[in-house]
Swiss-Prot record:
GO terms for biological process: symbiont genome ejection through host cell envelope, long flexible tail mechanism; viral tail assembly. The keyword Coiled coil applies. Belongs to the Lambdavirus tape measure protein family. Serves as a ruler that controls the length of tail by stopping the tail tube polymerization and is probably released from the tail shaft during infection to facilitate DNA translocation into the host cell. Assembles into a multimeric linear form probably arranged as a coil of alpha-helices and stabilized by the covering tail assembly proteins. Its C-terminus fixes the tail tip complex, thereby forming the tail assembly initiator complex. Tail tube proteins polymerize around the tape measure protein, displacing the tail assembly proteins. InterPro entries: GpH_LAMBDA, Phage_tape_meas_C, Phage_tape_measure_N. This is Tape measure protein. Its main location: virion. Residues 42-72 form a coiled coil. NCBIfam families: tape_meas_lam_C.
């Protein structure tokens, strides 16, 4: 079938098209069958993989269960496995030369020993192993008992008629130690003779000597606690006398150890021991107070130094010793219950009380603890025993507790009881005999002297340590400075060597290391100098400076305040009160429908009001809804009162229901008025905004007469900015509004400047033209889409009518192709002449004006005329030729225009050739259709195509 269109002869072979369509359908069917087969194969493969995976997982789980059962039955399995792994790793490390031979053999022996032990342990798990083990143990025990019996029998036979010393000589001879044991045995003989002279046996003597240190400790403790000397002599002296068989024997034993040498050594050792004990006591008294303050969060609000000053102040006017006073202070501070004032009052009273009556400080403090727990009840209980309160004092303490807090009440109650007992203890002290007063003064003097010795001893020890440490630091400083000098010398030598030609990299690593040593030495020297300054500052203050520093350290940054403790107590009371109320309410059983009934009644009331809606914009206020809820609650409670017990809150609500409803109605009326007023205010705001907008619109309308559309739009935008700003609460004269208007005018000025720039407009137009011409993807896409759609329409027309008109299709496709090529040639020509970039179909680029300069004429059937800068006429074929010579090499898939010598032109679009010939026989459209479908199939099956992606998805590739 041949049609002539605008002088062009087009030949279409319909049978070829039909064969192509049939081949395409057969291929599509075969492709679908292949895809189905491939999908089935993939599914079966996936099922097989899943089953294999499940089988492997089941085997792994069974193996794990077996190992767990084996380990549960035989606990040696895991240990032997670990030893096996360790042995393999040891062999590997030994073969690599990491483990020395000696270590390897030693560890190997240990592994063998461990394996043997585990093997025996495994054998013990069976009945045969247990029986063999028991039999071996029985044989071993029998042999040991036999040997022990014979040794004991021989010893008894050899001891007949011999003294203890002779038996020791015999035993030493058996062991081969006669020479070494001879001096010791001689001392035993001397001791035996002394015992015979004293009239007691060796056993009694050993027992007496064993008990002597404990008896001496009891004597010292009794004297330190204030017990009279005569009582100590009666109690402890009699025990010591009886232990050694009388007074004479006792002094004989003691005198036997005294000689000029032992006496001097004893005095020296005793003096050092006394000083050490005194220093330790001083250190412990300070640290105990500090630790007590830290453990209690510093609730007392003082430092250790302040508490120590309190102790010294009390000791000046008290009959008690400074040591006992410090113990009382420490115990009170560690309790965390008392403030500084309370500690001072309790300590003073307790010290006098204990010194006058001999009662322990802990017992006295326990009396004050009754006040700390509850001041009113505590005073009442103490008064039952000590009879010290007067009428009205308990009421005063209770008033303090309610008005100023628990802490203030405890302080006042403590002071009241402490003052009374202090006066009574002073009366007891005044009535003491002269001997008792003298003994009390001696004890106090001894305690004060002991404290002074302890403080100075502790300070002197710290001073000596600092002096020695300072000397060591000075030596370290000299060494650090020497390291710095040596490293500097080495570094300077390396730098001098590096300055020589070709030696710039010499010793770079060593130089860096030496520089690090210099820096480290300087830092170390500075730190040592700082430490030395601190030591010198401490040494200048003398030995007592260390004691003062110890008492001042560890001051807490934040003290636990009385207000915090009082707040915590009140918080605990409130929680306890709420819990009691909650427990009381939890006993009331409410019906599960009460809450639903209450909500239902409230919703019905709200619905009724909404149904009676008569005014525009009428709304329910929150207060009105609350009224409905209150009325519903009261109605439900009335009904529930006959079915269950009401809580106190519910009873109170029913008792005052009329008043409650009246107040709720008043709130509802006010709430409705507020809602209505809010609506009126909103309407007022909307009205004002509308008036402002219309006023601005009217002014803008009047001002825009005679203006262009663009100026009118600008006036409207400026008016809207002003109106929106005023409606938001601003005023017309605000600086912010003027800034907004200025910014908008600046934008208009920039827009006008752009409109006046004709060169930029030309450049923009050329750039847009170039973007459209060089958009090969979009242009070819459009051509291909038009071609496919046109072919589809043509095929439909042919199949339905038996006729096909190729005229419009050919016009459109050929026109689009020629337009695309012409646009690119024009753009490349102009761009090349202007020194810009030129582009090819394949996306390549070249610069300069080579496209125009390399154009050569080529015979063509048609010539398109275009206007260039020189006015020369250039044919389209010549332009296309110049493009080809300057890098526009079209690929097989790119559109191509080929001019034949015969005058015909063939346009190739994606492999489909359309031959345009005036008067010659056409090749037909069948070849183009066939090539087009082949290309579509090839692209679908190649990498990235639809068929390829489908197969990859199914196979998991």
């Amino acid at each position: 079938m041949v049609d002539k269109v605008a002088g062009l002869s087009l030949d279409v072979d319909v049978s070829t098209v039909q064969r192509a369509v049939k081949s395409l359908k057969e291929f599509s069917k075969a492709n679908d069958q292949a895809a189905d087969s491939m999908g089935s194969l993939i599914n079966e493969s996936e099922v097989a993989k899943q089953k294999a995976k499940e089988h492997a997982e089941q085997l792994r789980r069974q193996r794990k269960e077996y190992e767990a059962v084996e380990k549960a039955i035989d606990p040696t399995v895991s240990k032997m496995e670990r030893l096996k792994i360790a042995s393999q790793q040891l062999d590997k490390l030994w073969q690599q030369g990491v483990v020395p031979d000696e270590t390897f053999f030693r560890l190997g022996e240990m592994l063998d020993l461990q394996n043997a032990k585990l093997a025996r342990s495994r054998a013990m798990l069976t009945e045969e192993g247990q029986a063999a083990l028991q039999e071996a143990k029985a044989k071993e025990q029998a042999a040991v008992r036999s040997k022990a019996f014979m040794d004991a029998l021989n010893g008894q036979v050899n001891a007949i008629g011999k003294t203890h010393a002779e038996l020791m000589e015999l035993k030493a001879a058996e062991l081969g130690l006669s020479k070494e044991a001879a001096p010791l045995i001689a001392k035993l003989k001397d001791q035996g003779r002394a015992m015979n002279a004293a009239g007691i046996s060796a056993g009694e003597y050993r027992q007496a000597m064993r008990m002597l240190p404990a008896q001496i400790t009891d004597v010292v403790t009794s004297l330190a606690s204030g017990m009279p000397v005569w009582m100590v002599a009666i109690q402890q002296g009699g025990q010591i006398k009886d232990s050694f068989g009388g007074i004479g024997n006792t002094f004989k034993v003691l005198l036997s150890y005294i000689n000029p040498v032992t006496a001097g050594v004893g005095v020296l050792v005793g003096s050092l021991g006394i000083l050490a004990k005194a220093g330790y006591d001083s250190y412990k008294s300070i640290t105990d107070i500090q630790n007590a303050l830290i453990e209690t969060g510093g609730y007392a609000g003082v430092t250790a130094e302040e508490l120590d000053s309190v102790s010294k102040k009390i000791a000046q006017t008290s009959n008690s010793t400074i040591g006992s006073i410090r113990e009382i202070v420490t115990e009170l501070a560690s309790s965390g219950k008392y403030t500084r004032e309370q500690i001072q009052n309790i300590t003073k009273a307790t010290a006098e009380w204990s010194a006058s009556t001999g009662k322990s400080a802990s017992q006295i403090i326990s009396e004050f603890e009754k006040i700390a727990s509850d001041p009113v009840k505590g005073l009442k209980k103490l008064n039952e025993q000590y009879n010290f309160l007067e009428k009205g004092q308990l009421t005063y303490i209770d008033t303090l507790s309610r008005t100023k807090g628990e802490t203030e009440a405890v302080s006042e109650a403590t002071k009241l009881f402490a003052d009374v007992m202090e006066k009574r203890m002073k009366s007891i002290a005044d009535n003491a005999t002269p001997l008792e007063k003298m003994w009390s003064d001696i004890k106090q003097w001894a305690s004060d002297a002991w404290g002074w010795v302890g403080d100075h001893t502790l300070g002197a020890l710290n001073l000596i340590i600092d002096v020695v440490q300072g000397t060591v630091i000075q030596v370290k400083m000299i060494l650090a400075k020497g390291d710095e000098y040596i490293s500097n010398f080495i570094a300077s030598a390396i730098k001098a060597t590096q300055s020589l030609p070709g030696m710039s990299d010499f010793g770079a690593d060593v130089l860096k290391e030496q520089e690090n040593i210099v820096k480290s030495s300087r830092d170390n020297y500075d730190q040592l100098a700082s430490d030395l300054d601190a030591i010198n500052a401490r040494v200048e203050k003398g030995e007592m400076g260390y004691i003062e520093a110890m008492r001042q350290r560890r001051t807490l940054e934040k003290q636990y305040s009385e207000e915090t403790k009082e707040a915590i107590r009140k918080e605990a009371e409130e929680i306890e009160k709420r819990n009691r109320e909650r427990n009381k309410q939890s006993k009331i059983v409410r019906s599960p429908t009460e809450q639903f009934d209450k909500e239902l009644i409230s919703l019905r009331a709200q619905l009724k009001v909404l149904q009676e809606h008569k005014e525009i914009g009428q709304k329910l206020s929150a207060q009105r809804k609350a009224l409905f809820t209150t009325e519903a609650t009261i109605a439900v409670l009335r009904e529930a009162s006959s079915k269950r017990q009401l809580s106190a809150e519910e009873k109170a609500l029913l008792a005052s229901q009329e008043r409650v409803i009246e107040l709720a109605k008043q709130k509802a009326e006010i709430g409705d008025q507020i809602v209505k007023q809010q609506q009126l205010n909103d309407l007022t705001d909307k009205s004002l905004k509308f008036v402002n907008e219309m006023t601005a619109a009217t002014e803008q309308l009047n001002a825009s007469r005679g203006l262009s559309t663009r100026d009118m739009e600008r006036q409207a935008e400026l008016a809207k900015i002003t109106t929106d700003y005023i409606n938001s609460g601003g005023s017309e004269g605000d600086e912010k509004l003027q800034n907004m208007i200025k910014a908008q005018n600046d934008y208009y000025a920039a827009e006008d400047a752009k409109r006046a720039d004709w060169l930029a407009g030309a450049e923009s137009a050329f750039a847009d033209y170039g973007d459209a011409a060089m958009d090969m993807y979009g242009n070819v896409n459009e051509i291909a889409s038009s071609a496919l759609n046109g072919m589809s329409d043509m095929m439909v027309q042919f199949l339905t009518t038996g006729k096909a008109n190729f005229e419009d299709f050919a016009k459109n496709i050929i026109g689009m192709i020629i337009k695309m090529i012409a646009q690119m040639v024009i753009f490349n020509t102009i761009s090349g002449m202007m020194g810009g970039k030129t582009w090819s179909f394949a996306g390549g680029a070249s610069s300069g004006a080579s496209a125009a300069s390399q154009a050569t004429p080529t015979p063509a059937a048609s010539v398109f005329r275009s206007v260039s800068s020189g006015g020369a006429a250039v044919s389209l074929a010549a332009a296309a030729g110049s493009v080809a010579t300057s890098g526009f090499n079209a690929s097989n898939s790119a559109p191509k225009v080929v001019n034949h010598s015969g005058g015909g032109t063939v346009v190739d679009v994606s492999g489909m050739e359309v031959k345009v010939d005036n008067g010659s026989d056409p090749r037909g459209i069948s070849q183009g259709v066939e090539m087009m479908f082949k290309k579509m199939i090839r692209e679908s099956c190649s990498q990235g195509g639809e068929v390829y992606n489908y197969i990859q998805e199914k196979t998991g590739g």
